[in-house]
């Protein structure tokens, strides 16, 4: 307990949560989990923890358990209360602050679990330490049940934290499997030998995954590059040098592939430094200097070859992980490392080790330099093509594409650019738009897949050149986000397979070539309606099949009596729940049948694998609450009940399904999809660069086999699959 230092109170956390966890949306909600897991990882870094369990509980709470030493439970020397209470209720109270417990540690500026406690509706903590099991409970940062001993644990040690985020603070109200999965996998790669077991007991499909990697960063690079063709083996080196506050350790794994993009992932004390920092600048400097020196010394690079650092990083996947005793982070949410001495230390380690690798592997060095020279030549060829896309000045309308129908407003913060599929929809959008703030750019045919094209070929493509010119930020070396002519760039395509393909091609372009537009939140997806529903003189527009089903069930249950299996009449809420469940069973059974399986056989097969089988079993398990089982469904009585309710709901309705944007007239398109007062739009965000990179490589890259495998594994998760 004497190692726990108290620096300040935590009253401010609930008043200004964004200052401590970044935001109160999805990112901040999941950040709570990272804070608790970081404590367990700190125990692993210190050599005391080998197993971490993360569980999303059925009630929406989350548990993190480890087999570390357990949070201290003895009395704090100055606070005169148990140390665990201090750690969990006082901001900046933790063993990491006096340097004797942990050599290095992560956690958000040390606010850690106390911050999570303050922002949780409730938190329960169980500690195994000193042969006893200790239990304490909190609500919104205050103790509700004091520390008590609830059992014996022998020689076992560890901490188990369960918390439920305060929904009055957060706009996000559920943990997402994918988001947590990516971060936990990342932590297992960064801390080789640690086992992280992740389970979701809340969702329909009970996901479960175990992450354990003895290969560490090398396996991380292999994982990131699994959908790319390698041009070099994985190059790994590590070293340590004294810094201002102790020993700085650096570890680097890198590999070149045939990709035209670069993926750089940097970490300090396991914290993902999204904006890079001194460790990244040190690596880049060393890479550039080493390639230049080796190339010149071995006559592979001539004096006339004007190579840039960007040329040398084309196709590179690299992970730089440093351990720094007292890290300085720029920004409250740790996105950029600021310790000046780390640049020189990383640069020195990389220069020495990379030069040695090149000298011992001349064939690999030659391959890397040849790729660099190709990238430089493509960049030079692109320079000429780029001239045609260069802006003559922000918002002056000079040299804009002929088919762009621009708006009159000159303030980019107020303007929107709609990228519309096809000329017919472009015509409707052009006629119906608000000419003051909305610009229309019709796109003819498919946009080039930039995942498979070098920059010179990309800039030779007319649609891409038009896009670059219209957006106004320039490209490559001339890129300047401040010159964006619109702060909303809206992709508006049909709700069919072709529309989805065009949308994906455009997202690939923005993610690979203009990622800052996504980072700034400038890229959106329009959500045009799928159906027009008319009743008497009233017209409504419906976005999705699910929304239409819900509407029909609501209307159908009006004056319609639904009984349970025992003959009891269900109240309105229970009837709606039952009908919604039956509609879900119908949709899942239909998808299973479309994939060539018999749902009646699958649901009774204990060994049946796959998402379809598990979804059906979960749905039928829910159905048992009403007294029915799978046999009642497959006998036909329940599908008939569902059809009867829907038919009742359809009485007096006219339902029209739009096949494309071009089927709407100008006023209709504006009212449903473009009118700021009524429209639905999705903002495109990327919270995990590695996951996004992997997905774009998988879906849009050259390797066919991984894509086929992905489609086979995920076919059941989509309604509209085009073979």
What is the predicted function of each stretch?
Residues 1-723:
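Conserved phosphate-chemistry cores used by DNA topoisomerases
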């Amino acid at each position: 307990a004497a190692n726990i230092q108290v620096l300040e109170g935590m009253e401010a956390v609930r008043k200004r949560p964004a200052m401590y966890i970044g935001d109160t949306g999805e990112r901040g909600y999941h950040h709570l989990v990272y804070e608790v897991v970081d404590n367990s990882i700190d125990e692993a870094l210190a050599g005391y923890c080998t197993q971490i369990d993360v569980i999303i509980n059925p009630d929406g709470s989350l548990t993190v358990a480890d087999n570390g030493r357990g949070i201290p439970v003895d009395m704090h020397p100055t606070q005169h209360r148990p140390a665990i209470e201090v750690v969990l209720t006082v901001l900046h109270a933790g063993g990491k602050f006096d340097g004797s417990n942990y050599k290095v540690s992560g956690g958000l500026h040390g606010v850690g679990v106390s911050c999570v406690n303050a922002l949780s509706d409730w938190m329960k903590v169980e500690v195994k330490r000193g042969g006893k099991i200790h239990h304490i409970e909190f609500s919104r940062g205050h103790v509700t049940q004091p520390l008590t001993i609830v059992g014996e644990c022998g020689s076992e040690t560890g901490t188990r934290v369960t918390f439920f985020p305060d929904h009055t603070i957060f706009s996000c109200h559920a943990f997402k499997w994918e988001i947590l999965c990516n971060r936990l996998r990342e932590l297992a790669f960064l801390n080789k030998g640690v086992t992280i077991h992740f389970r979701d007991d809340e969702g329909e499909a009970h996901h479960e995954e175990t992450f354990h990697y003895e290969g560490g960063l090398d396996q991380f690079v292999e994982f990131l590059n699994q959908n790319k063709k390698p041009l070099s083996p994985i190059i790994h080196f590590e070293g340590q040098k004294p810094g201002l506050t102790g020993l700085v350790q650096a570890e680097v794994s890198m590999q070149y592939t045939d990709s035209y993009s670069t993926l750089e992932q940097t970490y300090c004390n396991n914290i993902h430094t999204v904006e890079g920092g001194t460790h990244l600048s040190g690596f880049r400097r060393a890479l550039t200097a080493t390639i230049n020196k080796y190339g010149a010394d071995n006559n592979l690079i001539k004096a006339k070859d004007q190579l840039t650092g960007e040329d040398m990083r084309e196709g590179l996947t690299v992970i730089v992980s440093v351990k720094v005793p007292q890290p300085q982070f720029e920004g409250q949410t740790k996105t950029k490392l600021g310790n000046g001495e780390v640049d020189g230390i990383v640069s020195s380690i990389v220069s020495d080790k990379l030069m040695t690798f090149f000298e011992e592997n001349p064939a690999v060095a030659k391959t890397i330099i040849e790729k660099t020279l190709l990238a430089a030549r493509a960049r030079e060829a692109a320079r000429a093509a780029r001239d045609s896309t260069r802006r003559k000045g922000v918002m002056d309308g000079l040299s804009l594409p002929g088919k762009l129908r621009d708006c009159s407003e000159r303030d980019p913060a107020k303007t929107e650019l709609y990228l519309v599929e096809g000329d017919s929809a472009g015509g409707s959008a052009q006629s119906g738009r608000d000419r003051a703030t909305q610009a229309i750019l019709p796109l003819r045919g498919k946009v080039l897949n930039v995942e498979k094209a070098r920059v010179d070929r990309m800039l030779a493509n007319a649609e891409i050149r038009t896009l670059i010119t219209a957006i106004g930020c320039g490209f490559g070396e001339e890129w300047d986000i401040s010159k964006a002519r619109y702060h909303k760039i809206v992709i508006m395509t049909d709700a069919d397979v072709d529309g989805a393909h065009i949308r994906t091609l455009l997202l690939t372009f923005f993610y690979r070539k203009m990622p800052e537009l996504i980072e700034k939140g400038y890229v959106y997806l329009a959500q045009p309606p799928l159906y027009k529903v008319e009743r008497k003189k009233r017209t409504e527009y419906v976005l999705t099949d699910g929304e239409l089903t819900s509407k029909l069930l609501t209307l159908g249950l009006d004056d319609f009596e639904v009984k349970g299996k025992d003959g009891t009449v269900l109240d309105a809420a229970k009837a709606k729940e039952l009908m919604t469940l039956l509609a879900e069973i119908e949709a899942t059974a239909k998808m299973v049948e479309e994939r060539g399986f018999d749902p009646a056989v699958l649901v009774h097969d204990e060994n049946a694998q796959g998402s379809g089988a598990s979804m059906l079993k979960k749905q039928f398990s829910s159905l048992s609450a009403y007294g029915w089982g799978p046999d009642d469904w497959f006998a036909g009585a329940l599908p008939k009940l569902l059809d009867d309710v829907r038919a009742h709901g359809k009485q007096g309705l006219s339902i029209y399904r739009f096949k494309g944007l071009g089927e709407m007239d100008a006023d209709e398109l504006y009212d449903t999809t473009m009118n700021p007062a009524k429209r639905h739009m999705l903002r495109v965000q990327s919270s995990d660069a590695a996951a996004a990179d992997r997905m774009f490589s998988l879906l849009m890259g050259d390797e066919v086999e991984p894509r086929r495998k992905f489609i086979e594994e995920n076919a059941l998760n989509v309604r509209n699959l085009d073979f």
